[in-house]
Structures are given as C-alpha cells and as structure tokens.
Regions:
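Charge-dense, extended regions
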Residues: 223, 232-239
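Preference for long, solvent-exposed alpha-helical segments and helix-linker "stalks"
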Residues: 2-219, 223-227
Length: 242
C-alpha cells in the first residue's frame, strides 16, 4: 500500500485512501514506539483530509471519520476541543452527533483546568443543541441531545451567576433581539434558583410584549408577586384573567 500511495496521486482511487486508514489503524494498535505511533496517527488524519479534498462528495463523511480518529487517539482535551471545533465548523448540522457530545466533554475538562471560561462551555453547549435542532429528529439525535443536556447540567458550569454574567451584557447591547431573549428565558428558566433576578424578569417581560398571552401574563404576575411588587403583579393578573 505504501508504494502505491507514494507513486499514485490521491485521485487514483478513493479505496487507496480508505485501505490506508484501515491498514495503518491496525499498525497503530500494535506499535509501542510513541514517535512512530504519532507519525502513523498523523498519516491517518492526512488521509481523511485528502479524501475530503479530492472526493468532495464524501467530504462530510471524511471529516466525521477524522473526528472519530481524533477522539480515539488523542487524550489531551485541548487537542480534542480544537480539532473537533474545526470539524464541527465545517460539517455543521451534518456532523456526527457523538462528536458534539465529545466536544462538550472536552470543553468541560478544559474549564475545570481553567483553560477556557464558562462562556466558552456555554457557547459550545448551545451550538451543539442548535446543530441537533437543524439536523432534525432521529433516535440517535434524541439520545445524544439527552446526553449533552445531562452532561451540561451535571458539569455545573451553567450556574446562575455564570449565566447572568454571560447574558446581561448581551441583553443590554441588543434588548430587542428576540432570539437572544428567548435563549435567556430558556437557559435561566431551566436553571434551579435562577428566576428571581432582573435579567430573567426583563427577558420574560420582553417576550410577553412581543407575544402577549394569558400564560405569560400569569407568569409575570407570579414573578412580580415574589418581588413584593403588588401593583405590577395585579396588573399582570388582571391581564391574565381578562
């Protein structure tokens, strides 16, 4: 195979690239020499890049394959995070769903080491969920989504303080951005003990003004009641029952 790969251009045969991945993959398992192993891993990743470049019809598959090799061969969360982010950026909603989960896991590991901030982890999580939404419903996507949400919640990165610190300047800069407002309500609303703050109240109020409903009016009544703002609470209660 090595002779054929050396003599023939990548366009000679896609199977030549695929066979190379298989053969070298077996050799990687056997070798004990760290330097040789690193070179072999680099070759496998390069073969995936060549497949994506010269056989664009299979580019998505090639990059997803590369992502799997990266998570298989690299244990450094920084390498995994950086490399998977590149693949996710290219493949978007066509990325293999499990890579989104592994990318978030790497982000959380880096956060624990103070290598990245909470905002980076939250952005990684939100991007993963957005891509799964675009990809559509499937059993695989639903399971991965559940795993991603579970991992994110148990990581405790999305503390109320972190969310408020992240979203307050965004809201102040663009208070009429309904996508942002909806996101704030969703994120803070699903975080335990994160509904009794001005950011959440302002976002819910903005959503209600944009799309008034009896349920949102009643929710605002409850929020203002909790803050002992009786006059405003009564106003929303009357709106809810009218």
């Amino acid at each position: 195979w090595r002779k054929a790969f050396k003599l023939c251009p990548p366009t000679a045969s896609q199977n030549m690239l695929l066979n190379g991945m298989t053969l070298i993959g077996k050799e990687i398992v056997k070798t004990k020499d760290a330097q040789v192993r690193a070179a072999m891993i680099d070759t496998v990743l390069t073969l995936n890049d060549l497949r994506a470049e010269y056989y664009p019809k299979y580019a998505v598959t090639a990059y997803n394959s590369k992502g799997q090799y990266i998570t298989q061969y690299f244990k450094d969360p920084q390498v995994v995070y950086d490399q998977l982010n590149k693949i996710i950026e290219i493949n978007q909603e066509k990325v293999k769903p499990s890579l989104l989960l592994l990318d978030l896991n790497a982000a959380i590991e880096l956060y624990k080491k103070s290598a990245i901030g909470a905002e980076d982890v939250i952005n990684t999580y939100q991007n993963a969920i957005a891509l799964l939404d675009k990809a559509g419903n499937s059993d695989d996507n639903a399971k991965i989504r559940s795993d991603i949400e579970g991992l994110f919640i148990t990581s405790q990165v999305a503390s109320c303080d972190n969310l408020i610190a992240l979203f307050t300047p965004r809201y102040e800069a663009d208070p009429d951005n309904m996508d942002l407002v909806t996101n704030i309500v969703k994120m803070l609303g699903s975080t335990e003990g994160c509904q009794n703050n001005d950011l959440f109240l302002n976002a819910v109020t903005k959503m209600h003004k944009n799309e008034p409903s009896a349920s949102s009016a009643y929710y605002l009544y409850k929020l203002h009641s909790a803050k002992d703002e009786s006059e405003t609470a009564i106003k929303y209660f009357e709106e809810a029952v009218s």
